[in-house]
């Protein structure tokens, strides 16, 4: 695994963690809250964003305008049954969701969820590190690398891992501050 390949894989893990963070409510309306909502549409699980235009007319409202009015009830049901705790209001043309301010208890729950997503991201980074170090050790065993070269490579991999873990921790701190901000 080349150094660039290693960086790319680690960067993808950090991006996946950021996408997970984006799905956590912060008390303000944000279209990415609905990224994980799938709608049972003609017998197929379809992402909500491919069935409708999602916008935020103000900081407390999400507006959903389906491309096909026949899917309105399905979209409404998918949102209502999600774990987001949001209640959709259907006026026949647009589904509006009022995003209420978060309670203190809900804020703490979302902070725990963010911490869990961060830990999952760190575990993914550690798995990438383990695979890379295993490859370096194999090269050393096959006498393609000296002990010193192997040690230097492993140190470089560890430093890279530490850098990306610090990045995830920074994003976690930002997300927690965002969630706890009233």
From Swiss-Prot:
Keywords attached to this entry: Cytoplasm, Protein biosynthesis
GO molecular function, one term: ribosomal large subunit binding
UniProt xrefs under InterPro entries: Ribosome_recyc_fac (IPR002661), Ribosome_recyc_fac_dom (IPR023584), RRF_sf (IPR036191)
Pfam families xrefs: RRF
Cellular component, GO, one term: cytoplasm
Superkingdom assignment: Bacteria
Organism of this sequence: Prochlorococcus marinus (strain MIT 9313)
Protein name according to UniProt: Ribosome-recycling factor
Main location: cytoplasm
Compartments reported by the entry: Cytoplasm
């Amino acid at each position: 695994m080349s150094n660039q390949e290693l960086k790319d894989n680690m960067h993808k893990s950090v991006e996946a963690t950021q996408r997970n963070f984006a799905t956590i409510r912060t008390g303000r309306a944000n279209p990415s809250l609905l990224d994980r909502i799938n709608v049972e549409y003609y017998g197929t699980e379809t992402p909500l964003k491919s069935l409708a235009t999602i916008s935020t007319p103000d900081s407390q409202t999400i507006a959903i305008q389906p491309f096909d009015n026949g899917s309105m009830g399905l979209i409404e049901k998918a949102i209502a049954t999600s774990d987001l705790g949001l209640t959709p209001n259907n006026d026949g043309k647009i589904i509006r969701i009022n995003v209420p301010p978060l309670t203190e208890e809900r804020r703490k729950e979302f902070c725990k969820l963010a911490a869990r997503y961060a830990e999952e991201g760190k575990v993914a980074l550690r798995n990438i590190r383990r695979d890379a170090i295993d490859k370096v050790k194999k090269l050393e065993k096959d006498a393609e690398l000296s002990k010193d070269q192997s040690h230097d490579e492993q140190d470089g991999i560890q430093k890279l891992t530490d850098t990306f873990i610090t990045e995830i921790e920074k994003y976690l701190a930002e997300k927690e501050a965002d969630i706890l901000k009233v």
